């Protein structure tokens, strides 16, 4: 036994630390009205305690799940700490899911309370009769801002916390007690819950705060475009508090003008989000001759970042792209592609290519790739197989499931097909369900998409495998055009020196838009169903 002091790792201690050390550091958010509202860690801490004590007075017990359908705002920050700090579980609900899935999640989590934005009141009005566990709905507004609603047992957030105690002391909780709950997007079957503990969350926060995690600086100003319902906002609400970093929360303002306004007014230095958001922002900036002068880096996750986007960020805005990888089951940060001094010395083209990789595992995370027989494959950058992961913030068992989701040695199957090179860089080749099996060989839809998206007339690209009478499957390229040009031959010619000859798509189909799922990813399952017979008609 060591002689070190025992210290239980609780979420409440994190906001207490921020209140004590960084009370004046700002948390800026955009209200539904469009107004920019300024809070800080000191105010968030006090109001989180008011919320925590109010939940305790209401009768919420330790370990009970408290639901939220909330935007990125200061009140959501208060919920992150008030709910988890008092011993309940912060259950963030993806409001972009199908209503039936939202009802399923609320019932599965047995939420007694639901906190929601006023704009989501109609959604919950339609669902409330199918959500028998919910006792009260708390609208994230003041009494004066309360809309007319058919919700039963409804109260404003400000009324709910007004009698709370801002000097409330967080209870001492077991570090393995649950603090957060997120559900997978459920593209196949019902969503599955992933339950995070205080310990796993704080370990993830420490790792994310490291130089090889997110590479943050205490003077950074972070634009948090990633939704706070998505894997606990990628851990940024916690990382911000641990490091005293200014957070800029955009609310519903995700369009180009709204984001540019926040970036310029709040001197944003780092921006976090998915590729679809940045595609819109880059196009807006280009059309309006805007340069994002304050931003030095953007961390992009959710889906693979194309070479063309990395190049555009650098050439047009002098912004470095850090690609990160993770999933709901990994809390989420598992790998990051942080720019190194060696990368800075490379020719730009070579550096951009390296930046398309998902990066190296951060401390605490172990990766390996295996074949269909479970044999570990070499890390030579050529072999690719199932990506397996384990670590202290990796899911072991889904919420309310009877059996573990890991093998006997603790390895979790991510569902991704990947390669790992000799330097430790991991590359997602494809999702196992999306990889195209043509004549017994695999074709990466991700690599094909990234290549196609570099064409100047291509705004978005998606590759799917469709049935073929001879080869089982062949790739078809779906393109959202960037302009009026719809020239298949031009795109085919562009791809010739970028992909293997047998990877060439059998056809190119121009479409108006790609179907986007609740987490910002393209719904390939819908496209495969729509075009499944395209090559055998």
Where are the language model's segments positioned?
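Conserved AMP-binding/adenylation subdomain of ANL enzymes
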Residues: 202-221, 229-269, 284
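Structural core segment of the AMP-binding/adenylate-forming
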Residues: 14-16, 58, 85-159, 483-484, ...
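Flexible, low-complexity linker/hinge segments
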Residues: 1-9, 125, 145-178
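Conserved beta-loop-beta connector loops within the AMP-binding
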Residues: 361-388, 422-423, 484-488, 523
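Gly/Ser/Thr-rich phosphate-binding loop
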Residues: 242, 268-273, 282-353, 366, ...
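AMP-binding/adenylate-forming catalytic core of the ANL superfamily
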Residues: 97, 103, 114-116, 271, ...
